[in-house]
Amino acid sequence: MTSASPEDQNAPVGCPKGARRRRPISVIGGVSLYGTNQTEELDNLLTQPASRPPMPAHQVPPYKAVSARFRPFTFSQSTPIGLDRVGRRRQMRASNVSSDGGTEPSALVDDNGSEEDFSYEDLCQASPRYLQPGGEQLAINELISDGNVVCAEALWDHVTMDDQELGFKAGDVIQVLEASNKDWWWGRSEDKEAWFPASFVRLRVNQEELSENSSSTPSEEQDEEASQSRHRHCENKQQMRTNVIREIMDTERVYIKHLRDICEGYIRQCRKHTGMFTVAQLATIFGNIEDIYKFQRKFLKDLEKQYNKEEPHLSEIGSCFLQNQEGFAIYSEYCNNHPGACLELANLMKQGKYRHFFEACRLLQQMIDIAIDGFLLTPVQKICKYPLQLAELLKYTTQEHGDYSNIKAAYEAMKNVACLINERKRKLESIDKIARWQVSIVGWEGLDILDRSSELIHSGELTKITKQGKSQQRTFFLFDHQLVSCKKDLLRRDMLYYKGRLDMDEMELVDLGDGRDKDCNLSVKNAFKLVSRTTDEVYLFCAKKQEDKARWLQACADERRRVQEDKEMGMEISENQKKLAMLNAQKAGHGKSKGYNRCPVAPPHQGLHPIHQRHITMPTSVPQQQVFGLAEPKRKSSLFWHTFNRLTPFRK
């Protein structure tokens, strides 16, 4: 019997014999630069579901999925400095003869036969299995095949109108039932099973314990099997806390490695090629990621000081988060900038020289096999993971533990930071939809809607009563700070004409009971009014049903509350982001069809709904939203129709 080789002894836990992991693994997934036989093992574990709808074909929202690796190209003059030195180190696979006569891959060696040095060897060896390439999917399916309940926590909201997709909110617990695809997993939440984007969730470290928050209700037989499995694999509370502490430390070290690769591998090379990148372009693409790298290095040092290597469950790391909670505010700027960075990168990637350049940067830095947009997404994901990690750590920290109070305070602090950033991201995504909506409105007058507003709160039809007692049926859109009034086209009910707006900052909402209103001297039903604080002018509105009126009253109250919250949190959208959203919407509106006599026809209006303010996946199978209107008031016949019949080119 042959003894284990040094390479086998140094192999990380969870890896096949001899398959030594050379590089750390990203928290955003991906594949290793070096070969692995885990793919075959994963395929053997996967079971085909009995009957499930097809997997969604669109890209994962709100950010596109991590791009596939660019194929090698012939490098041009834009090749980063130093790439020629990569070829001097000939990377070879040294083969070890196993006991069964086969060959197994071992460590990489250079030309002189010595092993390459790398700073994260200990990290790779000590990392949990889910940090290994393909290890997360493999670990999930192993647990599922063994009858365990696998739970994941949502990082972001996922709102969808597709029945084939699972909707949830940040912090919700999802039971994972299948993870055969790296982008889409099959899971259960609130008694519903459907597909959901894998990048939206964080796999729980301690999967042995069935989540108390899980809304799934397994049968008695499944419950008995899960109970036996928990008794078989469950560890004590100290071990559970150890698992969470190790996850925080391991992922933090890997995260620092990715930030270093971005700063040294991409930014440094870009600055050397002034002919390809301007200072403004680099600021747009990378934002303040160098400041984040500097901050995270200090934060990791603080964590290392508090980390008890011998007994990790005794580590007291809560104070590290509390001492640095103000520093985490720099993530807000980065997350605000990230959508613009994606647009700038997408424009550059249309040119081959930029694709070659960024791939060459990755190879020169010996980074893992993920495109640049995947690396730039890591800070956005990281700041959303902290509250989930701290929540799980708090769960396994007893009140008698010396770190309990600090962990509890740190959890609340990081949750507030993540909520603020999530809200900013949601608003940034909504302004594009609002800009496209404005472009679709015919005859828009005055300032752009984005000059004052960034969120649609409610919309619907109301009857406006004028001073003369006339009723006007209008479609109203309530944004933060303003209420926009539109009129439907007589022929095309999906086309809207701009009719005016009210400044909600100057209005006072008054609920009216059914009966005669003294201001207008009219009998009204399901009515409310807005009174100007400066001019005392009264605007009277009537809803079709009492339920509609109640929704409008609640929406007006929500509008005032959100405006106040945005003011307290300093929630502002930059002028550049607003201008960019309007510019993109106007470009998208060009080239539309023209009506009779070369009169431009506005694009069909698609009513915005408050649900659209979050991450929306709109499948093609969902029909266009129907608009149910109130009855049009009768009008006298007009000469217009007689003239129209003579001019129209269409004949029966």
From Swiss-Prot:
Residues 455-561 form the PH domain. Residues 98-150 are annotated as: ABR (APC-binding region) domain. Its main location: cytoplasm. Residues 240-424 form the DH domain. Both the ABR and the SH3 domains contribute to maintaining the protein in an inhibited conformation by associating with the C-terminal tail. Binding of these domains to the C-terminal tail inhibits the activity of the protein by blocking a region that is required for its GEF activity. Gene3D superfamilies: Dbl homology (DH) domain, Pleckstrin-homology domain (PH domain)/Phosphotyrosine-binding domain (PTB), SH3 Domains. Residues 1-24, 81-108, 209-235 are annotated as: Disordered. Keywords: Cell junction, Cell membrane, Cell projection, Cytoplasm, Guanine-nucleotide releasing factor, Membrane, Phosphoprotein, SH3 domain. GO terms for molecular function: guanyl-nucleotide exchange factor activity; identical protein binding. It holds the Pfam family SOS1_NGEF_PH. GO terms for biological process: cell migration; filopodium assembly; lamellipodium assembly; regulation of cell migration; regulation of small GTPase mediated signal transduction. The modification Phosphoserine is found at S78, S114. Transmembrane segments: none annotated. It is found in: Cytoplasm; Cell projection, Filopodium; Cell projection, Lamellipodium; Cell projection, Ruffle membrane. Acts as a guanine nucleotide exchange factor (GEF) for RHOA, RAC1 and CDC42 GTPases. Regulates cell migration and adhesion assembly and disassembly through a RAC1, PI3K, RHOA and AKT1-dependent mechanism. Increases both RAC1 and CDC42 activity, but decreases the amount of active RHOA. Required for MMP9 up-regulation via the JNK signaling pathway in colorectal tumor cells. Involved in tumor angiogenesis and may play a role in intestinal adenoma formation and tumor progression. This is Spermatogenesis-associated protein 13. The gene is SPATA13.
